[in-house]
Amino acid sequence: LLAAVEGDQPFIVLADENGKDPVRTQNAGRITPEMGLPDAEWAIFAEGAARVAETVKKETGLRTVFHHHCGGYVETPAEIEKLMSMTDPQLLGLCFDTGHYRFGGGDPLGGLDKYIDRIWHFHFKDFNPTAGRKSAVEGWDYFQSVQNGVFCELGQGEIDFAALVAKLEQSGYNGWGVVEQDVLPGMGSPKESARRNRQYLKSLGL
């Protein structure tokens, strides 16, 4: 059905099972190299991602992007770089998520520059630095960090979306841009949050 959609063809968004590994979940936002996958498991991981992308392409004609995500095995800039270096750039693209990239220790504008040719799908997600620092001090796990607003509404955090949008436009990017906003129980109305985020995007000319 997805392959039959007219207009801009959708993507299959692939991610690992976020929030299942206790160490990764507990230390989201402060992952160290020692918490990463061993080389042998990286090989299996990358091969699995490539196999999914290849099968999807062959059977449906759709392309696949990988969504890096805090609380999973591909969180930090180094881990994203490793997966990208181990997979075919013609086969597997990157779903670049600004909030997860920042919480994972990266600079979103720098990441956009680095992977601009590999980014086929883009997630608008803001980052609250105060909540991020408190997460580190208090030792919050991934879900506690989200509940405490580490991924705030657009325009309420530190990410420079105007600069990111300008860079996307300069590069000729014409793919999807999706707002991924976490609104857990007790965090307000998802509908009102979506409305405010839409107004913010309009302020950027989108």
What positions do the PLM features span?
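Active-site acidic/histidine proton-transfer and metal-coordination neighborhood
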Residues: 1-94
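Histidine-acidic metal/acid-base catalytic patches
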Residues: 50-54, 77-96, 102-206
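Short, flexible loop segments at the rims of nucleotide/cofactor-binding pockets, characterized by
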Residues: 70-71, 99-101
